Amino acid sequence: MEVKDILKTVDHTLLATTATWPEIQTILDDAMAYETASACIPASYVKKAAEYVSGKLAICTVIGFPNGYSTTAAKVFECEDAIKNGADEIDMVINLTDVKNGDFDTVEEEIRQIKAACQDHILKVIVETCQLTKEELIELCGVVTRSGADFIKTSTGFSTAGATFEDVEVMAKYVGEGVKIKAAGGISSLEDAETFIALGASRLGTSRIIKIVKNEATKTDSY
């Protein structure tokens, strides 16, 4: 697989709590230069970033991030606000407390409400696979499918582990037709990226792939 084809799947990501505007600018410049799928950045930078790229790059942001236990109303507001400010894609975090309580209906209803707030913008649902049993992940594949979301996403990159090949294999087997897969967190090589794509991921959330291409990768990057 050619590097340029891998790059087309990448949501070039900077979600560090201390991210500065010059660092965000670098993410945006690199994402445009290497023609990635999007740049994924904190919501507080969306308006400025959207003005900066002026339609040349899709802007992705996160809501309910990274823990997911804010209220549905708060997440809906975050979504609407991000879209108003120029976000093209939304990555939301589900409420894992509902999952652990076995309340999958509430999880599904929340995703439905946020998808309605997204209108025709892309919605990716982060399920935080490192915190799930295999049975919970299988159930959530059905929940995300029924909710009308566009993607199921493995990880925030802020928990105990990121994407694994096994997680993506399970998603590819159990998610419904029309729902795509985003692998995120800890994707540390072009070889891993290619494997995730081969297993069924059509998006990769990472900050490292462009750095690898530019020979700038460091072992301290978690996302």
From Swiss-Prot:
EC code: 4.1.2.4
Record's GO cellular component terms: cytoplasm
Organism annotation: Streptococcus pyogenes serotype M4 (strain MGAS10750)
Catalytic class of the enzyme: lyase
One MF annotation (Gene Ontology) recorded for this entry: deoxyribose-phosphate aldolase activity
Swiss-Prot/TrEMBL keywords: Cytoplasm, Lyase, Schiff base
Cellular compartment(s): Cytoplasm
Reactions this protein catalyses: 2-deoxy-D-ribose 5-phosphate = D-glyceraldehyde 3-phosphate + acetaldehyde
Designated name of the protein: Deoxyribose-phosphate aldolase
GO BP, sorted A to Z: 2-deoxyribose 1-phosphate catabolic process; carbohydrate catabolic process; deoxyribonucleotide catabolic process
Pathway involvement of the protein, from the record: Carbohydrate degradation; 2-deoxy-D-ribose 1-phosphate degradation; D-glyceraldehyde 3-phosphate and acetaldehyde from 2-deoxy-alpha-D-ribose 1-phosphate: step 2/2
InterPro entries to which the protein is assigned, alphabetical: Aldolase_TIM, DeoC, DeoC/FbaB/LacD_aldolase, DeoC_typeI
Catalytic residues (UniProt): D91 (proton donor/acceptor), K153 (schiff-base intermediate with acetaldehyde), K182 (proton donor/acceptor)
Physiological role: Catalyzes a reversible aldol reaction between acetaldehyde and D-glyceraldehyde 3-phosphate to generate 2-deoxy-D-ribose 5-phosphate.
Protein family according to the UniProt entry: Belongs to the DeoC/FbaB aldolase family. DeoC type 1 subfamily.
